[in-house]
Amino acid sequence: MEEAINNVLLLLREDSISLETVLWETHYVLLNLHNEQNLRLVVAQLIACGRIWDYWNEHRSEYFAFWVELISRKKVTNNGLPFSSFVKSIVGILEVDASNEILCFRRICLLCVFYKLLSCDHIVNLQYPLKRAVSKALSKQIKTHQFSGFEANFLLQQLFASVDSSASDISFDAFSLLPHLLKWEEIVWSGFINYLDTEHKRDSLPTAVLCHLLLRLSTYQQISIIKRLITLIDKAIPSWKSRSSDSKYNDHQFVKKNFFSIIMVLESLAKSQYRKSNVLAADRSLCEYIILTLFHMEYLFSFVASSWSTLDFVITTCLSRVAQPAKFISETVREAIIDSIQLEGYVDLQKLSGSPVLVTLSFINNWQNLICRRLEKQTVNEKVITLSSTAKEISSLGLSFAEKLISQSDESTLCKHYVYASLYACLFCNLNEGSPKDYLDNDIYVHARCLFLLTKTLNLDSLKSILCSRVRLYYNIEIAYYFTDVLLKWFQPIIRYEFDNALIFYKASISLVSVLAPAAQKQFLSNYLNSIQGFSTETKEDLIFLVSSQIRQMPYQNATSLLSFWLSIVVGRAV
């Protein structure tokens, strides 16, 4: 055995022997050692062996596999030192302060392994005294060590990931190692930054740990983290842009991974806010910082191809808590609208591609939906739609801007986003002010032209959403009905020369019967039937059937009387 010990000590110093041989010999000697002094020699040399640690740093699963097998076999074999003595001896070695930072970190890594393995009942059955000794030693080392970004990331991978490399489970028990979260905040943040800078495309563990840690922090500590995140984004985005466009890297996945990691962090904070019933000033401040973070991430939104429920949840939750949601409508959109109206010409889409147009789109969209839901539930009065001066200015110019923008919709892949941004801004202009005729005669035909142009670019469901959203925002029944009446009359003559687009509009407008007040529903159905007479008999029959189907989907009591009325006027016209 003495010869085997000398041999393995030599192998650990030698660079020419294969790693597989070195690890196998080390494993064998550690398993069969009878003398604690020799055990200390081998472990100390193992800690000092740089090439083994370089390999383990790149292959965490191999690192865990080595120690899992060793401790599992040590528990059941009678060779060498007893199991308890074996663990206590190694822990005693690892407790001693190392001569330099690198060796100190390697000692911490080995303590992490023993901590994880002693937490697994299938490896060690309730070895509480041993685990307590390891936990105490590990806690002391973590408190005093200054972790680099790489070390922090590696530490998180060891402490929070499953011992089984094939499992995706994450255990947060390791947070109990330190009595206060301040040191954890430092380690987790450092590990998260390192994760964003590296090529880990699948393993998002540092992000998950940061999300969990945020839930343990106070609101003011969360704000501090968000401020750091904004600073990080501002510094990192130029290099991420360069990396995505540089032919040497051309790595969109790297940047995409970072974008979704940041959104995960914001989602975690939004969820914590969503669960709160008593919203304080600090909570409102946090929500404003979350919104601000999204604006700073504008470039990254190119990775969102369509509506995303996670992002919608974050935005809606924060908007429901901030004091003035409208102030987040971007200055970029405002300036672009004013320029296009003043020039009375072509809308410069390149100018609109600046920050933060796409984020503004999401905000206005979710804000509109939030107000709709509140109005439906009658939890707020009409004053909720009071806008800031900037938002009012956008709204007053929005219709003309939307018309110009939609007419250019085929000239840019992003134009669909801008169409939505302008239309959702228009949804708030002059709602419910004045008499129906005074209000609508000025703007209704611009609305109609915008909707007509949208029939060329949007699918049926999107058009339904826009129409219904516009009508649902009226609390004045008379104005809501007048709006739909003028729309139907405007589209009626178009049937003769723009059949396809008119048909799409009439199919979409069927959904309006569900959102109108009961007093206006029957009149709307009468107007609808009158306005579709320009279609062929076959097309009219299809539209009549679609109206019947829409009515059947409504609540039973209302649907029964409406369906009876609808059938009576259809039969009456046929006769």
Curated annotation (Swiss-Prot):
One GO term (biological process): protein import into peroxisome matrix
GO cellular component: cell division site; cytoplasm; mitotic spindle; mitotic spindle pole body; nucleus; peroxisomal importomer complex
Keyword annotations of the record: Cytoplasm, Cytoskeleton
Subcellular location: Cytoplasm, Cytoskeleton, Microtubule organizing center, Spindle pole body
Keyword Cytoplasm applies: yes
MF (Gene Ontology): protein-macromolecule adaptor activity
Source organism, top-level taxon: Eukaryota
Keyword flag Cytoplasm: yes
The name this protein goes by in its record: Uncharacterized protein C323.03c
Organism (species): Schizosaccharomyces pombe (strain 972 / ATCC 24843) (Fission yeast)
